[in-house]
């Protein structure tokens, strides 16, 4: 699990290996993200940027609008949660990134997604 807070936006991520959807050389992980506005000003998530690393050092960058087809607007005290997935060629790796947030007044900032592990149980000591 990882947690980061940027300008009142808390991002928490938990990942899980999905053996039923994996096979040798293709390891599927789901991750659940909770984005909470702990600040005093509304903010909208408009885009995402993920950096995905596998155990071989291969790096993939994923950039796009919103998350799971949405651009959630969070009032103070509100949160948004979603689950997505990632496929690696190796049994472990990591993800990290940022969400581009925009305040109602137009101020934009990047909310940090702290690095979190993607690990098949029993593969690391």
From Swiss-Prot:
Species in which this protein is naturally found: Anaeromyxobacter sp. (strain K)
PROSITE patterns noted in UniProt: APAG (PS51087)
Pfam families: DUF525 (PF04379)
Entry protein name: Protein ApaG
Ranges for domain ApaG: 3-125
SUPFAM superfamilies xrefs: ApaG-like
Tree of life domain: Bacteria
């Amino acid at each position: 699990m990882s947690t980061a807070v940027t300008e009142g936006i808390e991002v928490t991520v938990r990942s899980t290996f999905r053996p039923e959807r994996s096979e040798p050389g293709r390891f599927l992980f789901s991750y659940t993200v909770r984005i909470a506005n702990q600040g005093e000003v509304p903010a909208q998530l408009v885009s995402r940027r993920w950096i995905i690393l596998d155990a071989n050092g291969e790096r993939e960058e994923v950039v796009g609008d919103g998350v799971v087809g949405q651009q959630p607007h969070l009032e103070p005290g509100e949160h948004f949660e979603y689950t997505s997935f990632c496929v690696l060629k190796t049994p472990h790796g990591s993800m990290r990134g940022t969400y581009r947030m925009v305040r109602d007044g137009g101020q934009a900032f990047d909310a940090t997604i702290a690095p979190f592990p993607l690990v098949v149980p029993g593969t690391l000591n």
